[in-house]
UniProtKB/Swiss-Prot annotation:
Disulfide bonds join C28-C55, C83-C105, C149-C175, C208-C230, C277-C427, C434-C592. Pfam families: CUB, DUF3481, F5_F8_type_C, MAM. Induction: Increased in dorsal root ganglia in response to injury caused by dorsal rhizotomy. Increased in dorsal root ganglia in response to sciatic transection injury. Transiently increased in dorsal root ganglia in response to sciatic nerve crush injury, returning to comparable levels 42 days post-injury. Residues 820-830 have a biased composition (Acidic residues). Residues 277-427, 434-592 form the F5/8 type C domain. Residues 1-22 form the signal peptide. The tandem CUB domains mediate binding to semaphorin, while the tandem F5/8 domains are responsible for heparin and VEGF binding. High affinity receptor for semaphorins 3C, 3F, VEGF-165 and VEGF-145 isoforms of VEGF, and the PLGF-2 isoform of PGF. Residues 28-142, 149-267 form the CUB domain. One of its GO terms (biological process) is angiogenesis. Residues 835-846 have a biased composition (Low complexity). This is Neuropilin-2.
Length: 925
């Protein structure tokens, strides 16, 4: 009985205490309007939250198009254990069934969370065990600032500034600035001030976490990203020629800085009529900024940085931390650029005065900095021969220009250690006449304007076929379709003058295999239309059939294919052959406004002098493999190296031809526009070798780009002039790796008039070069001039021997001057010997005994024998006589030339005369 009142007292105290505690606890959960910013905290924050909590909040925006942003206080403490017991979760909607944006616990505050719609669901749960301080977050409407700061710029010049400049910029901004230029206008952007929040622990440039500025070559997130910038380092000057340059500015809710200010202006581009792709790209001049140069490593003392790798720099050069062929120097050109040549130097240490240089290197290129291709020579990686001392400049010219953005030089051998300075040569695609990018890369062409015959899946849709910027590419439904069955089409929006396409393979995606990631098109055709219904193919002017264009050899490296201008609004590309991985393609169309096009003469070949030229275009590892519909039949189109045809119109410009500098120190071919009152071709400049009768005389060599004609011979034409009596000689030699062959020679005064020379360049399995060699003997006055060297497609081969006297082989050859001392100084070791020529013994001064067989004409003998003795007996006798005649004393007279030119074949007793190539003499029978 006594315990009963005591029990009631305890119960009363318990419930009264519980009531007091409940009155002290803040409300847990609710529905909150984010029109006015507010805070949500765990119960009791910053003290330990209670156990057995289950709080739910719904935060909503007043407008359906508004978003909500949550920012957490860094003081965050919720029991760990993988968030099984205590946790806070945020869902992108108004209930527990909405998409989960995050589930958090532990001691690290969650990052900023932004809703996709106008509602967020927040839930906090705790169990009976240990507790912590909990959380505190701020909710508010997510303000992008787009209405205030996003803007398009179309005026010729202007200023772009961060919102509020020069005051600190606001939080939570996402602004877009777009500069739009008219055709043939270049956009130049230069920053005046730059100060954005950055991470103190930032590893490298572009590693921006909080506030940043992205610059795009085109529409944001469509065109290629040029760079991401933050901190206080001012970006260097940018030059864009695609017609659109965009900036996207992002800020978070924390620290704000002063922002940026930049000036832009538009510059009119007018390409020269005789466009040459050989300009220095800016390593020496500084146009390539320091931030664009990087390396695999740098020597530890900090005196041999990548930024010291500029050609002719006076402060050391670049040296890696360890001398290894795995090290590389990298240059980011920022935009797609035609690379035509590379010049290298070593360096002399300012500390030790020792010379270091690279003796050989490999070249790697990429359009995105991720997928790299090693430049190849056939199936093997091309190894460029570089320097022989620390100061010498050596130029390596690429056989075919490469379209790329990122370039790596990877040293292979070196002297004492790796030290490198360099310059890059080339041009932009848009530098050529009527070669504007019409919008695939920049995004000016919308996704709806790109279509295809079929597509594999969303990631490989036609809209993914944008050059470079796409993360994948177009892939048809059937990876091994019939040739010409599949196509990719671009609607340009309005009629344009179309002059070419840039084709690129497809990049790998998450849903494909490694094999499929290397898909590219090897050969293709192009058709065009003004209305989308009536289509015409680009024609081969020689065959009047649809032209079969060469495609890619690597899935990342783009290739330009040009053709005669055509009016078109719709362009289709038909893959004809492709890699084993199937059809994969990215594309850009080149051209200009319909009224802008005009006939021009353009040459994409480099005109810089070089020490070495590379051999055929680089090939991928899979280049020798082919799908079931792909064959290795050689293209019948003549593919001459860029710069072979040359009229030398501009001083110091020799197209793809080069001087032999090792023998050019005593005299130089000079460009002249003063013909001394004598006729010369079309009143143009030309090359001239001249001597005034001095003791040393003159000797010069002019060397062509590499030529590869494995299937059919062609006719080379040129104009020449030779004055100076018997002391003047001009000859043309074919030089291959293991042999040289004399093709054409004159050694007498030709008068003051210009004359035409024509030579058949025979088919040859190996790559070779054509060399013009001119000699004016010691003590002789004379002049040799050359102009307008070109391959002619309208001259029949039977008419391609001019003058005939230049092909006679009984004119003596020079062997280091032997037997010709009175006419040409033997100091000129012109290597006029011909290892493949018919003879070398028969010269007038040799005193060799003449024979009656030496004077016989084998043609006459053959005709008489076959007419007199009948077909069978005549053939037998003719064979014996030919053998005796040709083999006696090497037969270096006109008789051998006659036999070289003709071959007799018997068909049913009839005699047929057939022209053959001038490659082998009859003495080889």
């Amino acid at each position: 009985m006594d315990m009963f009142p005591l029990t009631w007292i305890f119960l009363a105290l318990y419930f009264s205490g519980h009531k007091v505690r409940s009155q002290q606890d803040p409300p847990c959960g609710g529905r909150l309007n984010s029109k006015d910013a507010g805070y949500i905290t765990s119960p009791g924050y910053p003290q330990d939250y209670p156990s057995h909590q289950n709080c739910e909040w719904v935060v909503y925006a007043p407008e359906p198009n508004q978003k909500i942003v949550l920012n957490f206080n860094p003081h965050f403490e919720i029991e760990k254990h993988d968030c099984k017991y205590d946790f806070i979760e945020i869902r992108d909607g108004d209930s527990e069934s909405a998409d989960l944006l995050g589930k958090h616990c532990g001691n690290i505050a969650p990052p900023t969370i932004i809703s996709s719609g106008s509602v967020l669901y927040i839930k906090f749960t705790s169990d009976y065990a240990r507790q912590g301080a909990g959380f505190s977050l701020r909710y508010e409407i997510f303000k992008t600032g787009s209405e205030d700061c996003s803007k398009n710029f179309t005026s010729p010049n202007g200023t772009i500034e961060s919102p509020g400049f020069p005051e600190k910029y606001p939080h939570n901004l996402d602004c877009t600035f777009t500069i739009l230029a008219k055709p043939r206008m270049e956009i130049i952007l230069q920053f005046l001030t730059f100060d954005l929040e950055h991470d103190p622990l930032q590893v490298g440039e572009g590693d921006c976490k909080y506030d940043w500025l992205d610059i795009w070559d085109g529409i944001p997130h469509v065109g290629p990203l040029i760079g991401k910038y933050c901190g206080t380092k001012t970006p260097s000057k940018l030059r864009s020629s695609t017609g659109i340059l965009s900036l996207t500015f992002h800020t978070d809710m924390a620290v704000a800085k002063d922002g940026f200010s930049a000036r832009y202006y538009l510059v009119h581009q007018e390409p020269p009529e005789n466009f040459q792709c050989n300009a220095p790209l800016g390593m020496e001049s500084g146009r390539i900024a320091n931030e664009q140069i990087s390396a695999s490593s740098t020597f530890s003392d900090g005196r041999w940085t990548p930024q010291q790798s500029r050609l002719h720099g006076d402060d050391n050069g670049w040296t890696p931390n360890v001398d290894s062929n795995k090290e590389y120097l990298q240059v980011d050109l920022r935009f797609l650029t035609m690379l035509t040549a590379i010049a290298t130097q070593g360096a002399i240490s300012r500390e030790t005065q020792k010379g270091y240089y690279v003796k050989s290197y490999k070249l790697e290129v990429s359009t995105n900095g991720e997928d790299w291709m090693v430049y190849r020579h056939g199936k093997n990686h091309k190894v460029f021969q570089a320097n022989n001392d620390a100061t010498e400049l050596v130029l390596n010219k690429l056989h075919t220009p490469l379209l790329t953005r990122f370039i790596r030089i990877r040293p292979q051998t070196w002297h004492l250690g790796i030290a490198l300075r360099l310059e890059l040569f080339g041009c932009r695609v848009t530098d050529a006449p009527c070669s504007n990018m019409l919008g695939m890369l920049s995004g000016l062409i919308a996704d709806t304007q790109i279509s295809a015959s079929s597509t594999r899946e969303y990631l490989w849709s036609p809209s993914a076929a944008r050059l470079v910027s796409s993360r994948s590419g177009w892939f048809p439904r059937n990876p091994q379709a019939q040739p010409g069955e599949e196509w990719l089409q671009v609607d340009l929006g309005t009629p344009k003058t179309v002059k070419g396409v840039i084709i690129q393979g497809a990049r790998g995606g998450d849903s494909i295999t490694a094999m499929e990631a290397r898909a590219f098109v090897r050969k293709f055709k192009v058709s065009y239309s003004l209305n989308g219904k009536d289509w015409e193919y680009i024609q081969d002017p020689r065959t009047q059939q649809p032209k079969l264009f060469e495609g890619n050899m690597h899935y990342d490296t783009p290739d330009i294919r040009r053709f005669e201008p055509v009016p078109a609004q719709y362009v289709r590309v038909y893959p004809e052959r492709w890699s084993p991985a199937g059809i994969g393609m990215r594309l850009e169309v080149l051209g200009c406004d319909w009224t802008d096009s005009k006939p021009t003469v353009e040459t994409l070949g480099p005109t810089v002098k070089s020490e070495e030229t590379t051999t055929p275009y680089p090939m991928d590892e899979d280049a020798t493999e082919c799908g079931e519909n792909c064959s290795f039949e050689d293209d019948k189109d003549l593919q001459l190296p860029s710069g072979f045809n040359c009229n030398f119109d501009f001083p110091e410009e020799t197209c793809g031809w080069m001087y032999d500098r090792a023998k050019w120190l005593q005299s130089t071919w000079i460009s002249s526009a003063n013909p001394n009152d004598r006729t010369f071709p079309d009143d143009k400049n030309f090359l001239k070798l001249q001597s005034d009768g001095g003791r040393e005389g003159q000797f010069g060599r002019l060397i062509s780009p590499p030529v590869h004609l494995p299937r059919s011979p062609v006719c080379m034409e040129f104009q020449y002039q030779a004055m100076g009596g018997h002391g003047v000689a001009l000859q043309v030699v074919r030089e291959a790796r293991q042999e040289s062959k004399l093709l054409w020679v004159i050694r007498e005064d030709q008068g003051s008039e210009w004359k035409h020379g024509r030579i058949i360049l025979p088919s040859y399995d190996m790559e070779y070069q054509i060399v013009f060699e001119g000699v004016i003997g010691k003590g002789r006055s004379g002049e040799i001039s050359i102009d307008d060297i070109r391959i002619s497609t309208d001259v029949p081969l039977e008419n391609c021997m001019e003058p005939i006297s230049a092909f006679a082989v009984d004119i003596p050859e020079i062997h280091g001057g032997e037997g010709y001392e009175d006419e040409i100084d033997d100091d000129y070791e012109g290597d006029w010997n011909n290892s493949s020529s018919t003879s070398g013994a028969g010269s007038p001064s040799s005193g060799k005994e003449k024979s009656w067989l030496y004077t016989l004409d084998p043609i006459l003998i053959t005709i008489i024998a076959m007419s007199s003795l009948g077909v069978l007996l005549g053939a037998t006798c003719a064979g014996l006589l030919l053998y005796c005649t040709c083999s006696y004393s090497g037969l270096s007279s006109r008789s051998c030339t006659t036999l070289e030119n003709y071959n007799f074949e018997l068909y049913d007793g009839l005699k047929h005369k057939v022209k053959i190539n001038h490659q082998k003499c009859c003495s080889e029978a």
